[in-house]
């Protein structure tokens, strides 16, 4: 941007009051924010007097980098205060330019004493560990409340623990936990949840009815009344042919008016119920074959109105009037008891979870915000001190992406805001608020958006940034065409037509560049094709074909770096999807066509093929009488049963489950029976094995018996598959280490993780993408831009399963379904909650669509499929009203992005759509709509007009057909990978040291999919040689005792006391004690090496976590970038701070060969030298004293070995 617009200037320069900047996509938001910070600094505000809050670490780092660059540029100008600017530049890295979590952590570190918090806490960064601790808390609370004969809790539990979903009570409590943790006063919020159920002897007088249901019904039907009235007054209704239609609608209108009046006047509930019931049967008419075209056309409109009216009446009746008032009161009263029990249980869960974390001195991310708010909000002198500190420290608080803030974060900001001392500068775009699953509340943005516009006082200002400097005019017009029909004050909270439209501002593009946006639609006629929740194979082929075509046409891209035109490259293209579920299939199809594809986020870990197979195998080991898991395993590469074989087995035993059929087929003397017998023998062995072994041992046994690791490694993306399977083994180990047992419980735990979308996958490659097409989710693309964007899966159905469950949680309420003996019925709170939640979900889906479409710089291509294209076009043509808006009822009935896009683009007066059939070689199933933007007064172009353009489009369609027909040969490109992540664990690095002295990896294998340098794991795990506990488990237990050993207690039974304490705290499994070698522990703690520990125990540091940036080439000789750094994370067993330096040590429980002890010790020493050197380097970086000695404590040999 060569210069700032008038509105940008205001956002940069206006001072002295609170400002909300509503910045549309591509409007230069970050540039404006950086320029404002620069102007503040130049005006004398020091950088440490500003608080700049973002919501991601990447955004915070980018902000720092940009501010540094701006300051550096300013310093080069003549006449500036160079010394002052240099001082500000040096402070950027330590300034409060950070995520809100990082700021909260600063608050806790400064004022921990005000809430009596141990300052040596550790941040819990492992989601699995946090989940396991939460699971433990949940099980403890569940067990206590069920055994305490608490009738209310039992009622809650029975209401949700149905035969089909025994985990539903737990799921509810875990879901509620996420909502509660985003609230500033979570206990108060939980305690008020039952209040909305309060009801005495009248439904009409209840809180829920008066505050929510009554206004909703009145508003909903007033719009329908107006619509009906407008039709009844039309002249055509006076014709005798429509006499019955008019009579029917007039009667319906009268009944509806009576009902609405009864609602407004708070008439008796049962009276309202009967009035609404009378509306259902009053609209009844038919059309006549004798009518002319005008009458038939009008009839179609009135028929649509009839359907809408019936639908609204029926939905309202089933939601709010399904039962009598007496029954409704009983449902509300019973529901209130259950919600009270839920609220009580949730508070207990939170408190128990917090206690478990405190016992380990751990904090998780939700703790940071909760504790920071606690510190800042209490009515105490220490809290006042904290508030005063930050209010005096910061002259301005700048919040980026303000639309993503939640209620707790907003309250934290308000605690450090002072009307007299500082101001707020908030910038964001509510149209891009897409993090509802993180409890982001766009309503907070909208509240200020409307308030600041209405007040127009000297204390508050709203600034709109609408100029788009990212996209060409066709892209901005496509975005406007879609969203001016969708976003409105009653859907999305803003009037897009008046205040939200993008203004084309990228005037730097050459005039010859603009290209039409495109919609590519595949007509899906085969019922066997994929569901509407998946991307169709033909859809992928259309994308591939269009890319090939663009490449063959030498499509030109304007390069903003050089200011010149150039040929399109693969890296100019991004493919955006709503979810990651189809990523692997897309990757495989691109590999077949040798088009490079860079995937920024993997498929959901639990949905990968290898994990699906493995989890299903575990399910049938637990219980083989499960048809779907059993058939999945049989069909997998482990056993390779094909469809014919499975059909043959089923035909032989049609009336039994598949396991019985399989067992029965073994008696048949043929090749297939042997195959069945082999499978059943292995299954029987594994089921027996499972009864006497740990889950982790069972998993590894499956890997060994089936060669699963090798089979999956041989498939495309095989190394990633292998790592995913190894990760499952690690998760099982962690699960058992946390004290959990049982295969069934483990399967349920994984299922809950899957349902909550906890992704445990190892990261994919983070190498430079190079010249490759990018594939990413829409959420992953936020903040990015690409010359050409394909948005695929327009038909993908929106997920509304939350509405079908037994509970619904909103920001201010929780609605439940009451379970009676033979039926379930929604409470009024649940019915109203469903309506609210559905609109919230659909509004967010519209905003997600906005983010997707605004990523494109020069060309936007929308791709999807429909069952019947012509039928869809006909539907779309009637949906927009005279103002060019989709009616609210249509928006609330949307099932996919295509529900929004189709009507918007089909009937926009700026858009001419030319429909061309692709030739029969692909079964005429593909349709392409080339969208060209005309002047405002251009009329809609029919198919027989503009022949030249049609011929050109036909030529393009034929070329696309030829390209599709070329896509056949499979030529999978195996590529060597030599990249690594920017993060490495020492436990991984030490595996990679072939030569620990030189720290080289010349002979090691590179596991591409994990993106970490590792040697292949081919050795059997130690537990296969153990009868009870593994060497690793015994070693871990030994480390634990040495970690907590009390060097201030010299009693003879000190060791036994320590062990007993650890068992009591549930940190140590009592069963392992007999396997410990206490003599080894006694040798060390009372030996010469530890004698100084007794003298100065405070100088002894144990289990110290560290993170350190090291040169990549220090670790990996062949790393290409000599300047690259890698973040190394590890845990040091211990070090002692002596007067002259640091003595570093590490316990090792490795077996020492007593027959050749010297050689054995030397091998162990070589094995761990590299690891200790990393620890030494890290300690030297963050400690004032230097390491003067490194030692391995070899417990098995009872020797202390120095490492040079």
Swiss-Prot record:
GO molecular function (one): double-stranded DNA binding
HAMAP family named among the record's database cross-references: AddA (MF_01451)
Family: Belongs to the helicase family. AddA subfamily.
Catalytic activity: Couples ATP hydrolysis with the unwinding of duplex DNA by translocating in the 3'-5' direction; ATP + H2O = ADP + phosphate + H(+)
Record-level GO cellular component terms: cytosol; DNA helicase complex
Name assigned to this protein: ATP-dependent helicase/nuclease subunit A
UvrD-like helicase ATP-binding domain residues: 2-472
Highest taxon of the lineage: Bacteria
Subunit structure: Heterodimer of AddA and AddB/RexB.
GO BP of this protein: double-strand break repair via homologous recombination
Its biological purpose: The heterodimer acts as both an ATP-dependent DNA helicase and an ATP-dependent, dual-direction single-stranded exonuclease. Recognizes the chi site generating a DNA molecule suitable for the initiation of homologous recombination. The AddA nuclease domain is required for chi fragment generation; this subunit has the helicase and 3' -> 5' nuclease activities.
InterPro entries, per the entry: AddA, DNA_helicase_UvrD-like_C, DNA_helicase_UvrD/REP, P-loop_NTPase, PDDEXK-like_dom_sf, Restrct_endonuc-II-like, UvrD-like_ATP-bd
EC number from the UniProt entry: 3.1.-.-, 5.6.2.4
UniProt keyword annotations, A-Z: ATP-binding, DNA damage, DNA repair, DNA-binding, Exonuclease, Helicase, Hydrolase, Isomerase, Nuclease, Nucleotide-binding
Lineage: Bacteria, Bacillati, Bacillota, Bacilli, Lactobacillales
PANTHER family: ATP-DEPENDENT HELICASE_NUCLEASE SUBUNIT A, UVRD / RECB / PCRA DNA HELICASE FAMILY MEMBER
Tagged with keyword Nucleotide-binding: yes
All copies of domain UvrD-like helicase C-terminal, residue ranges: 500-783
Cofactor dependency: Mg(2+)
Native source organism of the sequence: Lactobacillus helveticus (strain DPC 4571)
Amino-acid positions noted as binding ATP in the UniProt annotation, renumbered to this chain: 23-30
């Amino acid at each position: 941007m060569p210069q700032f617009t008038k509105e940008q200037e205001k956002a940069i320069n206006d001072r002295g009051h609170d400002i909300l900047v509503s910045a549309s996509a591509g409007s230069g938001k970050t540039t404006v924010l950086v320029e404002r910070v620069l102007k503040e600094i130049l005006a004398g505000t020091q950088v440490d007097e500003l608080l700049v809050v973002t919501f991601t670490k990447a955004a915070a780092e980018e902000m720092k980098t940009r501010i540094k660059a701006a300051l550096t540029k300013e310093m080069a100008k003549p006449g500036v205060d160079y010394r002052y600017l240099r001082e500000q530049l040096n402070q950027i890295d330590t300034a409060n330019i950070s995520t809100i979590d990082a700021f909260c952590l600063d608050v806790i570190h400064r004022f921990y004493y005000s809430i009596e918090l141990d300052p040596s806490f550790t941040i819990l960064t492992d989601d699995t560990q946090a989940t396991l601790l939460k699971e433990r808390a949940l099980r403890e609370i569940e067990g206590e409340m069920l055994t305490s004969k608490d009738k209310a809790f039992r009622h809650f539990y029975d209401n949700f623990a149905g035969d089909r979903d025994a985990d539903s009570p737990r799921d509810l409590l875990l879901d509620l936990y996420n909502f509660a943790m985003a609230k500033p006063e979570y206990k108060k919020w939980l305690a008020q949840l039952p209040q909305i159920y309060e009801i005495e002897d009248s439904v009409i007088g209840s809180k829920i009815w008066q505050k929510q249901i009554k206004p909703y019904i009145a508003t909903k039907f007033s719009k329908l009344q107006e619509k009906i009235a407008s039709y009844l007054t039309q002249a055509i209704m006076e014709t005798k042919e429509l006499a019955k239609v008019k009579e029917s609608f007039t009667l319906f209108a009268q009944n509806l008016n009576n009902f609405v009046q009864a609602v407004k006047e708070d008439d008796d509930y049962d009276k309202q119920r009967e009035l609404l019931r009378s509306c259902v049967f009053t609209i009844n008419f038919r059309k006549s074959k004798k009518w002319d075209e005008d009458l038939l056309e009008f009839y179609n409109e009135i028929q649509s109105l009839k359907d809408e009216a019936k639908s609204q009446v029926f939905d309202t009746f089933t939601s709010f009037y399904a039962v009598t008032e007496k029954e409704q009161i009983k449902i509300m009263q019973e529901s209130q008891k259950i919600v009270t029990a839920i609220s009580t249980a949730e508070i207990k869960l939170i408190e128990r979870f917090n206690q478990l974390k405190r016992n380990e001195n751990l904090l998780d991310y939700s703790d940071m915000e909760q504790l920071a708010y606690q510190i800042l909000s209490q009515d105490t002198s220490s809290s006042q001190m904290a508030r005063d500190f930050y209010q005096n420290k910061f002259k301005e608080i700048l919040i980026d992406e303000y639309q993503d803030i939640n209620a707790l974060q907003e309250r934290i900001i308000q605690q450090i805001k002072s009307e007299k001392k500082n101001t707020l500068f908030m910038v964001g775009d509510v149209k891009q608020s897409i993090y509802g699953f993180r409890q982001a509340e766009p309503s907070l943005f909208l509240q200020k958006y409307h308030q600041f516009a209405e007040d127009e006082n000297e204390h508050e200002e709203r600034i709109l940034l609408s100029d788009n400097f990212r996209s060409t005019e066709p892209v901005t017009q496509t975005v406007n065409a879609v969203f001016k029909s969708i976003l409105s004050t009653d859907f999305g909270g803003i009037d897009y037509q008046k205040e939200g439209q993008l203004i084309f501002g990228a005037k730097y593009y050459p005039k010859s560049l603009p290209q039409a946006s495109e919609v590519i639609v595949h007509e899906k006629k085969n019922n066997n094709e994929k569901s509407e929740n998946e991307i169709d194979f033909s859809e992928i082929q259309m994308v591939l074909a269009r890319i090939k075509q663009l490449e063959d046409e030498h499509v030109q891209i304007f390069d903003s770096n050089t200011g010149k035109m150039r040929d399109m490259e693969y890296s100019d293209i991004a493919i955006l999807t709503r979810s990651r579920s189809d990523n692997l299939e897309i990757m495989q199809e691109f590999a077949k066509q040798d088009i490079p594809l860079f995937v920024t986020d993997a498929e959901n870990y639990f949905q990968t093929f290898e994990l699906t197979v493995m989890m299903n195998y575990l399910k049938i080991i637990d219980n083989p009488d499960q048809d779907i898991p059993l058939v999945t395993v049989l069909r997998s590469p482990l056993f390779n049963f094909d469809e014919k074989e499975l059909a043959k087995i089923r035909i032989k035993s049609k009336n039994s489950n598949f396991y019985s059929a399989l067992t029965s087929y073994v008696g048949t003397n043929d090749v297939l029976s042997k195959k069945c017998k082999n499978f059943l023998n292995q299954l029987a062995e594994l089921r027996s094995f499972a009864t006497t072994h740990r889950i982790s041992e069972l998993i590894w046994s499956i890997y060994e018996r089936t060669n699963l690791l090798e089979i999956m490694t041989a498939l495309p993306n095989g190394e990633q598959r292998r790592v995913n399977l190894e990760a499952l083994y690690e998760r099982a180990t962690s699960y058992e280490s946390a004290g959990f047992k049982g295969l069934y419980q483990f399967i349920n735990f994984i299922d809950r993780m899957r349902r909550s979308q906890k992704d445990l996958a190892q990261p994919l490659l983070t190498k430079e993408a190079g010249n490759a097409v990018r594939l990413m989710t829409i959420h992953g693309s936020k903040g990015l831009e690409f010359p050409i964007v394909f948005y695929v899966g327009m038909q993908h159905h929106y997920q509304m399963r939350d509405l079908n469950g037994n509970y619904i949680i909103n920001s201010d309420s929780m609605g439940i379904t009451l379970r009676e003996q033979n039926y379930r019925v929604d409470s009024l709170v649940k019915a109203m909650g469903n309506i609210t939640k559905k609109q919230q979900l659909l509004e967010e889906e519209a905003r997600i669509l906005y983010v997707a479409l605004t990523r494109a710089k020069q060309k936007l291509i929308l791709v999807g499929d429909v069952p019947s294209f012509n039928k869809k076009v006909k539907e779309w043509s009637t949906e927009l009203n005279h103002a060019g808006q989709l009616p609210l009822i249509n928006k609330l009935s949307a099932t996919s992005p295509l529900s929004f896009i189709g009507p918007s683009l089909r009937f926009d007066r700026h858009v001419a759509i030319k429909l061309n059939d692709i030739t029969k070689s692909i079964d005429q199933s593909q349709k392409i709509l080339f969208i060209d933007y005309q002047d405002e007064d251009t009329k809609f172009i029919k198919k027989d007009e503009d022949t030249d353009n049609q011929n050109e489009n036909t030529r393009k369609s034929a070329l696309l057909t030829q390209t599709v027909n070329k896509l056949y040969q499979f030529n999978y490109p195996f590529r060597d990978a030599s990249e690594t992540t920017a993060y490495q664990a020492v436990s991984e690095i030490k595996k990679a040291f072939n030569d620990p002295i030189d720290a080289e990896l010349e002979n090691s294998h590179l596991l591409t999919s994990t993106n970490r340098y590792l040697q292949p794991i081919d050795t059997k795990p130690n537990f296969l040689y153990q009868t009870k506990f593994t060497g690793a488990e015994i070693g871990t237990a030994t480390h634990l005792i040495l970690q907590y050993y009390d060097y201030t207690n010299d009693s003879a039974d000190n060791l036994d006391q320590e062990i007993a304490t650890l068992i009591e705290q549930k940190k140590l499994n009592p069963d392992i004690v007999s396997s410990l070698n206490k003599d080894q522990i006694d040798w060390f703690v009372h030996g010469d090496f530890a004698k100084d520990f007794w003298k100065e125990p405070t100088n002894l540091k144990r289990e110290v976590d560290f993170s350190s940036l090291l040169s990549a080439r220090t670790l990996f000789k062949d790393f290409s970038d000599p300047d690259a750094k890698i973040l190394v994370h590890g845990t040091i067993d211990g070090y002692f701070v002596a007067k002259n330096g640091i003595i570093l040590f590490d316990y090792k429980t490795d077996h020492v060969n007593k027959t050749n002890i010297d050689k054995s010790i030397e091998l162990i020493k070589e094995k761990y030298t590299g690891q200790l050197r990393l620890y030494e380097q890290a300690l030297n970086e963050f400690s004032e004293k230097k390491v003067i000695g490194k030692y391995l404590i070899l417990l098995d040999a009872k020797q202390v070995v120095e490492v040079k």
